[in-house]
């Protein structure tokens, strides 16, 4: 029993004619989302970068060599506005972590790529994330973690189908 169960019982008491079974999982997911954001910020804080900025570096790294993407690909992949992405890219460029260059396949467009410093920082932060994640989730068995991941995948699919733009 936890505080969310207490909330659920209170709502059930106040609305006895309603099925409140969907309430606890949604509140837990919302709380988990907030805690995951805090966890991400704590992991990246020693590197003097925000979790959102790190997301850009990670997206470029995941793209594979030459670690470059169009800005539009970045904002779509990271679910950001084009204006927000422009601001982030400018900051990362000023920090020497990314650079822009003309897109050889589209004379009107540009590519954003990791600099050697950006690649090194991304690799260092990724390793920190892995270690912190493994430590955080160590109390869960591999089979439990796999089952939880599958349940979360199903929930995410429902939310994305229903609520994605």
Predicted regions and their residues:
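C-terminal regulatory/oligomerization modules of transcriptional regulators
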Residues: 1-17, 143-165
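N-terminal helix-turn-helix DNA-binding core of bacterial DNA-binding proteins
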Residues: 20, 34, 38-81
């Amino acid at each position: 029993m936890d505080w969310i169960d207490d909330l659920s019982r209170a709502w059930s008491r106040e609305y006895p004619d309603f099925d409140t079974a969907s309430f606890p999982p949604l509140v837990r997911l919302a709380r988990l989302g907030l805690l995951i954001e805090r966890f991400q910020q704590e992991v990246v804080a020693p590197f003097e970068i925000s979790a959102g900025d790190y997301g850009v570096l990670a997206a470029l790294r995941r793209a594979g060599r030459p670690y470059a993407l169009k800005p539009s690909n970045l904002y779509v992949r990271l679910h950001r506005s084009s204006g927000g992405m422009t601001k982030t890219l400018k900051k990362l460029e000023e920090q020497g972590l990314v650079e822009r260059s003309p897109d050889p396949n589209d004379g009107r467009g540009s590519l954003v790529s990791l600099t050697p410093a950006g690649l090194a920082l991304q690799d260092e932060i990724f390793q920190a994330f892995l270690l912190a994640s493994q430590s955080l989730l160590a109390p869960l068995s591999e089979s439990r973690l796999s089952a939880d991941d599958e349940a979360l995948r199903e929930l995410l699919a429902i939310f994305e189908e229903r609520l994605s733009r």
